[in-house]
Design a protein with these regions (language model features):
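N-terminal binding-site loop/beta-alpha segment at the start of enzyme catalytic domains
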Residues: 1-65
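Structural preference for beta-strand elements that scaffold enzyme active sites
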Residues: 3-7, 39-40, 46, 64-68, ...
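Conserved, mostly hydrophobic/aromatic
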Residues: 8, 33, 41, 54, ...
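Active-site beta-loop-alpha junctions enriched in small/polar residues
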Residues: 11-13, 44-46, 70-74, 109-114, ...
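Glycine/proline-rich, positively charged
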Residues: 17, 31, 77-166, 170, ...
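Structured C-terminal cap/extension of enzyme domains
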Residues: 29, 34, 39, 153-154, ...
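Alpha-helix-loop-beta-strand connector modules within alpha/beta enzyme cores
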Residues: 51-71, 124-135
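Short hydrophobic/aromatic-enriched beta-strand-loop microsegments
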Residues: 64-67, 156-164, 267-274
Length: 293
């Protein structure tokens, strides 16, 4: 299956208490994405009840989407230690049950620390799951030194990492290019920088740093040919990188999903001069801006 460049991230799916209303709301969002042509769905064992919601609402459409989830943390009433082999194995088995599927397309380590990656046990656990047919591919989701190690190691099929107009280490440190050279799939989280470009504040706690960077970059003045829609600018910048395979965006409602699809299909790409100017500003102004995990 060739995945769409726009994917749906499940971190923002409504989930309060796994009530029927939450399940129905999640189903409307998920089905709107599939109906609109999105075929990449990304969730995690630690995203509340989203795996169960997916199983209840779109398991019957399983052949229509590439299913990615993550593991490593102790969640869902499980016992044990984070990043233990037992936790990894239990998490994958629990995800299969929740998602109501006999296989997952991609299982990713969720922000696994560098020292744990270097030990190798969790990677071997993923490899055994792949050999057993529980997952088709294995990946790492993370940033900074751990992300580079994951790419250079050659153990993983995919990398999920943060990349956007105020988070450009994937470009400046050649991480995305290196992943491309190794024929890894690249999945981008936070591709629209939490919507901070042009805003006076951020609704997300970890978006404060993004907002600060945005303000510094914008102080250099307007960008020629900059799209009037900040969302179009940010998504256009992210998808302009030649080594970005899919960008995952969350949503609270079906209308937002449909709007995202329409924008990506009909309003992109943005002018290359805009992309190059954003590169220039980041490289000129960054002050050891590390990736936010």
């Amino acid at each position: 299956m060739e995945v769409t460049r726009l994917g749906l991230g499940l971190a923002e799916i409504p989930r309060h208490d796994d009530s029927q209303s939450d399940v129905e709301a999640a189903g409307r969002i998920l089905n709107a994405a599939l109906d609109g042509g999105i075929n990449f769905l990304d969730t995690s064992a630690c995203y509340g009840e989203t795996e169960e919601m997916m199983g209840k609402t779109v398991a019957h459409r399983r052949d229509e989407y590439f299913l990615a989830t993550k593991c490593g943390h102790v969640t869902g009433g499980a016992t044990g230690q984070a990043w233990s082999v037992e936790t990894i194995e239990q998490s994958i088995d629990r995800s299969l049950k929740r998602l109501q599927t006999d296989h997952i397309d991609l299982v990713q380590l969720h922000s696994c620390p560098l020292e744990v990656l270097e030990q190798g046990d969790v990677i071997e656990a993923l490899q055994r799951a792949r050999d057993a047919g529980k997952t088709r591919f294995i990946g790492h989701s993370g940033d900074n030194e751990a992300a580079r190690w994951a790419v250079e190691s050659g153990h993983f099929d995919t990398l999920q990492t943060s990349y956007n107009l105020v988070e450009q280490h994937g470009h400046t440190k050649n991480l995305l290019s290196l992943a491309g050279e190794k024929e890894m799939g690249t999945i981008i989280k936070r591709p629209v920088a939490n919507g901070v470009w042009g805003k006076t504040s951020s609704p997300y706690a970890y978006g404060d740093e993004y907002h600060r960077r945005s303000e510094i970059m914008r102080e250099l003045g307007p960008i020629g040919d900059e799209p009037g829609d900040p969302y179009m600018l940010t998504m256009g910048f992210t998808l302009a990188h030649p080594n970005v395979d899919v960008a995952i965006v969350g949503s609270h409602n079906p209308a937002h999903v449909r709007s995202n699809i329409e924008m990506v299909e009909n309003q992109l790409p943005i002018a290359d001069s805009v992309v190059q100017e954003i590169y220039r500003r980041f490289e000129q102004l960054e002050d050891d801006w590390r990736q936010l995990t």
